[in-house]
Structures are given as structure tokens and as C-alpha cells.
């Protein structure tokens, strides 16, 4: 899937001709021309015309052999968000289907959020809800994210790290759960390159050194197996596949091992025509080499929920090193590479029951999203979705031998509600592997779980919400209490909220006004206060969440008063600046004009950075970057105060700020000289420079430079990145 080549629209459409009819090609061409017109005069951060991006997204979807509406959605995916085009325009020009796909990947706009995190969580929730309606929404989004990751080098480093983190947390696991390994691998490897370039390039260089040795080893294995397979007249394809960089990195981190301690760096993959041949080849492999205990997995008999099927075994290979072998049919291989996309791939005359079977296989995903939708808080929604969708899984059995997949950490309560809500509600105990266990017992892969029920049970306990790990179980427990005890929940919720308000040290009469209560109920999407209190009563939302919203105005006022009091206690009566004098630091404390302010040397903030003030003892306010570790501690949080950069006209001219940067690159002759020359071209003064190289030929250059503002810094960083063999450039703290 990795592909640095920039495709033209003509190349994408020519690729699509290999499997689409002329009528559908005309539909796709129309979508491209519409997008080209809408994005005219728009450019990306790289400086290239914006339409290049939708073309590449559509190209990725064509590689997956998607249907015409999905490809059209790829061309059009940004027109509603970034141009004057509306969803109604798309419905009229194309279809309801195309408009729905574009809407699913369009971010929420024109709504104010408290934080970027909240906005991002709301955008993700919207996307996942749309995805529950049509899985093609996420295929377009994954193609969009894949191309954005391929062009990440054009963005500032902070944004690169944020997007890479989000990719590893959400999009790569999602590609994995949907079985699209081609996209998953590239997303993971690219994200690692930006998050930990030193380790990434170290692994790359080490793998390059041993490539020839590995290829000889694979040839030896393949030749031996090929000879045996041909003897029994089985047709097979063989390939040696090196492990992906991110999977090696994860293994090094999780197992606390060095690269030279990781032995299974490659796998041999064998593709055959039938399931019978898969097991026959497995027998041949185990005849040639001794299998390692506990390393055989039969995903043919027990497919993964993302529809992946294969036989995996690890044997002690010819030279005594572990060797992983994967055996599957050609059809299984298509599913392994393209997952859910293989089922959506455009096929003339696709059988109706085939689609229905596929929909049934993905019903688990829709169920999870349905339970997630109950949450009124978008960030809470995303956190619990990560648990249900993206955490490691355990596979347990019912007494009849059916396999149930649950997130790691699940307990018998999660199991019982996964079977049926009535079984969950009537649960009185559980047996695991024939032994009685408590309801908070952690389940492990291979456990046989039996749920004990009683028709005389009064239902679940409120405490079960805290014990359960899955959203499905939590949702069903809350639903039970919601239906059974509304009046009781309303009264209980009201008492809990009032108790929290008192704990926050506010008077109930000042806070619980009808206008304020209704305003907060609206914020939580409840039609009235009783619904809100009932939700608190059955643990739908917490009393503290409601109390915090109810006291928001009063807390801000109290915080301001306490802040002013701390300033007076800590700094005494600061000397006012002489009338008309401009501040040297260029920073002012919000709401207070006469405090001594200085820039901290630990993180060296510069104009344009997000900053915060720290109240020192007797030395005024020290200004730090918001991401400075020194202001992240619990102790520091109590002494923070809002500050802001002043306009240039109010500042005594301070021409230069000291900033340190770290440059990683391939250690070759002349590299340092080229870096110094590049910095000089940006008219930037250098105060110090040092460099070192490790045995993997990775050069690390530390440089202190004087810059005027954040834009000046970005200019320097971008210029250095243009140098051949530079891996990364990042700003560092002392």
C-alpha cells in the first residue's frame, strides 16, 4: 500500500476502468470534475494544489477496488468542509448515498468547544455514528488519513506528533479491527517515524544490515518446503515477509528486549487453493522442523472477528532460530490484506446473501456503537470506545463451546451481558473452568465460563457498573435501573448533585435556580431536570459532572479572587512599571498590569507559543510553555496563572530568543556543514552547536539558535528538513 508516487486523476480513473463499467466510470469522472472546480485556487501546506489530496484518496480506494459511490466520496470528501458546497448540492448533483458518505467524514463546524480535545472527540463520535450506518464511511476516512500521513512532513512538528498519536490510538487499531492490514501496517510504521524517529531509523538500519542473511535463510526454508509440497501434488505460492517496523518496536518495548534479541523478524507465508491443503502443508512444516509449544494458532477453525483466517505456527528453523509460518488459501489472503474492503469491493452480480452474511459479521461493531451513543460526553465516548474496539482481546468459551470475544480485563458480568441482557440481569454467580469465581474475576483466553442465574433475582447491583469493563454491559445495567426505578433515581440523583455542590462549598440557593438547572440539562441533551437527575441516579452521568456545570460561573469567580489573593501573598506589592515604559519580556498577566514577568530558561518560550505563568516566591511570574514538564506537576498546578503575549507595539524591542533544536540524520561526510549553511541562509544566529553519532550511523546534532518568533523557528526547521539524509528536526527543552 505504501506509495510515494503522486497519481493524476487520469491515472486513477484508468485504474478504475479495469473493473468498473463505462456508466460507473462516467459517474466517477463527474465527481472528480466537481471536486476540481470546488477546490480551485486552494492549496495544501506543501504548496501543491489541494485537489491533489482528493485524487490520492480516490486512488487508494480504487486500489481497494471500491464501488463507484465510495470512489466519488473519496474525490468529494472535503468539499463540504472546505468549500461553499453543501450536502444538498451533493444530493442533487450525485445521490443521497454519496452525500451521506461525505457527511460521515465531514468534521463538525461552526460550534464552539471548550478545548481542541473535546472538538476532536465530537468529530470522531460523528464519524463512528456515520460508520455504524455505512462502513464505507471509515474506508474513505482511512484512505484520507493514509494520504495525510504520507504527506505529514509538510506540517509543524507539534502537529505531526498529534496526528501520529491519534493515528496509533484510533485509525491503525480501527484498520486492524476491520482487517485492512495493508493500511494498518503503513499507518503504524509512518506514525512511529514521526513519534520516535531515532528508534525507527535504528530498526531500519539494523534490518538493512541483516537483509542478505535473512533472504538466504528464507530461500533455504522455502526450497525445503516446496520440495515436500510438490511431492504430494499441492500447488502453493511462497513468500518471505519481514516483520513491520512498528511490530518489532512494540515487541522490543513490551518484552524489554534489544533488537538483536528479537529472533522472529520474518515470517514465511504459504498460499494454497483449499482448506484441506492448508492442514496438509501444516503437517509437512511440523515434519520438517519442531513446533514451539504454545505457538500454534488455528484461525481457520476459529476466525478473528475481523474475518481473518489463517494457520499460524512457529517452529525451530534450520539454524535453530524461531521461524513463524502462516498458511492460508488465496481467498483468505485477500481478506487478510483488505479485510472489510474486500467484502465491499465492487463485483458485478454480487449475491444478496453474501452482503447479508457480511453485515451479520459486523453486527458486533454496530452493537458497540449503539451502546456508546448513550454517553453524553464525547471524550468519555471515545475513551470507552477505545476499550471496546481497540484494546487487546481475550477469547473465552461458553459451556457449549461457542467462542466469545471480549476486551482484555473483562469479567463474568461482561460475558453474561454479551450472551443476553436477561441472562445478565438474572446473574447470581459464575464458574470459570468448573470453579466458582467472584463477579470481578478477570477472564483469560481459553477460559470456559458458565453463568449461574436465578429467576428470583431482583436484577443487577448498582456496583456492577463499576465492575463491568465493556460498554455493552454498562449500558444494559443502566437501562435496567432506568426502566425499573425512575422516581427513585430522580430523588437519588438530586440528592447526589446537591451533596456534590455542598462539597464544592457553594450555597444551593445560589446555584440551583430554575434557569441554571435547565441550561445545564440542555448542555447534557436532557429535555428536563428530572431526566438529568434520573441519569445521575442510574449512573448514566456522574453527580460531579452535573455539579461542575451548575457551579461553572461561581467557580470562575472564586478562582479569580483566589488568584489575586495568591499573587498578593507570594509577590507582595510589586513595583509598578514606570509610566510609558514597555515590557522587555513581551508578556502580561491577564487582568493584572504591574507584575514582574520573566521568561523561563527551562523551555525558552517565544512569541507565538502557548504559554502559562507560574507564580514564584518573591520573583514575580515565570513564563513557561504550556507543554513544559515543570508546570505539569500537581504542586505547580496550584500556582499557575493565565498570561498572554503582548502586541509588538507594547513591547520594548527584544530581537532574539534562545531556542534549542535537535537534528537527527544519516551520519555522512559534510552533513553538519550543510546544516550550518542552511541555518545561515535563514539569517539566524547560532550560539552553540554539538554533535555525535551512534554505531548505527545516526547523527544527532544539538544546536542553540536565536530567533524572533515561532514563525522564524518554523522557517529554520523547514529549511533544515530540506537537506538530504535528515530524519527529523525538533525543538527541545533544557
Curated annotation (Swiss-Prot):
Residues 660-734 form the ACT domain. PROSITE patterns: ACT, HD, TGS. One of its GO terms (biological process) is guanosine tetraphosphate biosynthetic process. Residues 392-453 form the TGS domain. It holds the Pfam family RelA_SpoT. Changing residue 264 to G: Wild-type growth rate, this enzyme probably has no synthase activity but can still degrade pppGpp to ppGpp. It is an enzyme of class 2 (transferase). It comes from the Bacteria. Activated by the cyclic di-AMP (c-di-AMP) receptor DarB in the absence of c-di-AMP. Residues 552-584 are annotated as: Disordered. One of its GO terms (molecular function) is kinase activity. Residues 552-567 have a biased composition (Basic and acidic residues). It catalyses: GTP + ATP = guanosine 3'-diphosphate 5'-triphosphate + AMP. InterPro entries: ACT-like_dom_sf, ACT_dom, Beta-grasp_dom_sf, HD/PDEase_dom, HD_domain, NT_sf, RelA/Spo_fam, RelA/SpoT_AH_RIS. Residues 50-149 form the HD domain. Its EC number is 2.7.6.5. Keywords: ATP-binding, GTP-binding, Kinase, Nucleotide-binding, Transferase. Disruption phenotype: Decreased growth rate; growth is almost completely restored in a triple relA-yjbM-ywaC mutant. Pathway: Purine metabolism; ppGpp biosynthesis; ppGpp from GTP: step 1/2. In eubacteria ppGpp (guanosine 3'-diphosphate 5'-diphosphate) is a mediator of the stringent response that coordinates a variety of cellular activities in response to changes in nutritional abundance. This enzyme catalyzes the formation of pppGpp which is then hydrolyzed to form ppGpp, it is probably the hydrolysis activity that is required for optimal growth. Belongs to the RelA/SpoT family. NCBIfam families: spoT_relA (TIGR00691). Homodimer. At very low potassium concentrations, when intracellular levels of c-di-AMP are low, interacts with apo-DarB. c-di-AMP inhibits the binding of DarB to RelA. This is GTP pyrophosphokinase. It comes from Bacillus subtilis (strain 168). The lineage of its organism: Bacteria, Bacillati, Bacillota, Bacilli, Bacillales. The gene is relA.
Amino acid at each position: 500500500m505504501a506509495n510515494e508516487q503522486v497519481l493524476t486523476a487520469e491515472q486513477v480513473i484508468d485504474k478504475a476502468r479495469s473493473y468498473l463499467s463505462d456508466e460507473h466510470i462516467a459517474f466517477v469522472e463527474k465527481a472528480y470534475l466537481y471536486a476540481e472546480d470546488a477546490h480551485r485556487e486552494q492549496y495544501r501546506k506543501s504548496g501543491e494544489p489541494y485537489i491533489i489530496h482528493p485524487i490520492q484518496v480516490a486512488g487508494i480506494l480504487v486500489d481497494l477496488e471500491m464501488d463507484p459511490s465510495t470512489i466519488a466520496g473519496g474525490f468529494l470528501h472535503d468539499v463540504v468542509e472546505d468549500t461553499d458546497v453543501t450536502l444538498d448540492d451533493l444530493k442533487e448533483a450525485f445521490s443521497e448515498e454519496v452525500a451521506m458518505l461525505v457527511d460521515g467524514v465531514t468534521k463538525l463546524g461552526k460550534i464552539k468547544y471548550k478545548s481542541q480535545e473535546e472538538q476532536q472527540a465530537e468529530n470522531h463520535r460523528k464519524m463512528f455514528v456515520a460508520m455504524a450506518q455505512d462502513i464505507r464511511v471509515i474506508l474513505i476516512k482511512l484512505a484520507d488519513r493514509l494520504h495525510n500521513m504520507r504527506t505529514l512532513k509538510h506540517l509543524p512538528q507539534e502537529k505531526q506528533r498529534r496526528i501520529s498519536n491519534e493515528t496509533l490510538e484510533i485509525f491503525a487499531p480501527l484498520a486492524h479491527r476491520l482487517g485492512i492490514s495493508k493500511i494498518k501496517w503503513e499507518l503504524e510504521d509512518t506514525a512511529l517515524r514521526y513519534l520516535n524517529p531515532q528508534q525507527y531509523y535504528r530498526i531500519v538500519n539494523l534490518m538493512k544490515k541483516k537483509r542478505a542473511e535473512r533472504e538466504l535463510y528464507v530461500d533455504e526454508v522455502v526450497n525445503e518446503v516446496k520440495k515436500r509440497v510438490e511431492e504430494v501434488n499441492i500447488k502453493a505460492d511462497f513468500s518471505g515477509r519481514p516483520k513491520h517496523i512498528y511490530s518489532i518496536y512494540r515487541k522490543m518495548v513490551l518484552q524489554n528486549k534489544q533488537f538483536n534479541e528479537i529472533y522472529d523478524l520474518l515470517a514465511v507465508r504459504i498460499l494454497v487453493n483449499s482448506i484441506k491443503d492448508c492442514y496438509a502443508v501444516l503437517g509437512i512444516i511440523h515434519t520438517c522442523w519442531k513446533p514451539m509449544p504454545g505457538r500454534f494458532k488455528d484461525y481457520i477453525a476459529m476466525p478473528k472477528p475481523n474475518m481473518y483466517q489463517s494457520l499460524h505456527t512457529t517452529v525451530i528453523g534450520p539454524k535453530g532460530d524461531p521461524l513463524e509460518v502462516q498458511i492460508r488459501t488465496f481467498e483468505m489472503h485477500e481478506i487478510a490484506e483488505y479485510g472489510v474492503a474486500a467484502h465491499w469491493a465492487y463485483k458485478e452480480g454480487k449475491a444478496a446473501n453474501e452482503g447479508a452474511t457480511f453485515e451479520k459479521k459486523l453486527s458486533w461493531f454496530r452493537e458497540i456503537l449503539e451502546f456508546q451513543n448513550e454517553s453524553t460526553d464525547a471524550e468519555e465516548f471515545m475513551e470507552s470506545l477505545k476499550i471496546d474496539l481497540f484494546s487487546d482481546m481475550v477469547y473465552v468459551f461458553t459451556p457449549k463451546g461457542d467462542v466469545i470475544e471480549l476486551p482484555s480485563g473483562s469479567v463474568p458480568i461482561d460475558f453474561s451481558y454479551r450472551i443476553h441482557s436477561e441472562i445478565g440481569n438474572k446473574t447470581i454467580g459464575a464458574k470459570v473452568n468448573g470453579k466458582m469465581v467472584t463477579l470481578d474475576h478477570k477472564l483469560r483466553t481459553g477460559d470456559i465460563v458458565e453463568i449461574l442465574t436465578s429467576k428470583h433475582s431482583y436484577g443487577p447491583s448498582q456496583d456492577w457498573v463499576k465492575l463491568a469493563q465493556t460498554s455493552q454491559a454498562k449500558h444494559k445495567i443502566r437501562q435496567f435501573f432506568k426502566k425499573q426505578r425512575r422516581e427513585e433515581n430522580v430523588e437519588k440523583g438530586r440528592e447526589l448533585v446537591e451533596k456534590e455542590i455542598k462539597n464544592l462549598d457553594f450555597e444551593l440557593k445560589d446555584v440551583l435556580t430554575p434557569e441554571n438547572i435547565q441550561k445545564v440539562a440542555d448542555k447534557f441533551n436532557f429535555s428536563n431536570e428530572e431526566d438529568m437527575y434520573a441519569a445521575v441516579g442510574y449512573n448514566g452521568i456522574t453527580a460531579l459532572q452535573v455539579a461542575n456545570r451548575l457551579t461553572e460561573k461561581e467557580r470562575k469567580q472564586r478562582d479569580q479572587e483566589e488568584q489575586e489573593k495568591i499573587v498578593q501573598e507570594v509577590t507582595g506589592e510589586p513595583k509598578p512599571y514606570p509610566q510609558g515604559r514597555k515590557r522587555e519580556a513581551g508578556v502580561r498577566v491577564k487582568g493584572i498590569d504591574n507584575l514582574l514577568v520573566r521568561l523561563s530558561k527551562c523551555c525558552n518560550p517565544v512569541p507565538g507559543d502557548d504559554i502559562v505563568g507560574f507564580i514564584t516566591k518573591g520573583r514575580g511570574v515565570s513564563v513557561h510553555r504550556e507543554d513544559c514538564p515543570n508546570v505539569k506537576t500537581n504542586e505547580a498546578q496550584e500556582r499557575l496563572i493565565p498570561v498572554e503575549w503582548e502586541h509588538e507595539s507594547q513591547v520594548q524591542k527584544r530581537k532574539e530568543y534562545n531556542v534549542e533544536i535537535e537534528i537527527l540524520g544519516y551520519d555522512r561526510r559534510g552533513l553538519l556543514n550543510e546544516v550550518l549553511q542552511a541555518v545561515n541562509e535563514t539569517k539566524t544566529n547560532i550560539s552553540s552547536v554539538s554533535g555525535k553519532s551512534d554505531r548505527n550511523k545516526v547523527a544527532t546534532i544539538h544546536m542553540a539558535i536565536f530567533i524572533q518568533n515561532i514563525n522564524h523557528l518554523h522557517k529554520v526547521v523547514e529549511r533544515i528538513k530540506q537537506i538530504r539524509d535528515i530524519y527529523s528536526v525538533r525543538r527541545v527543552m533544557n
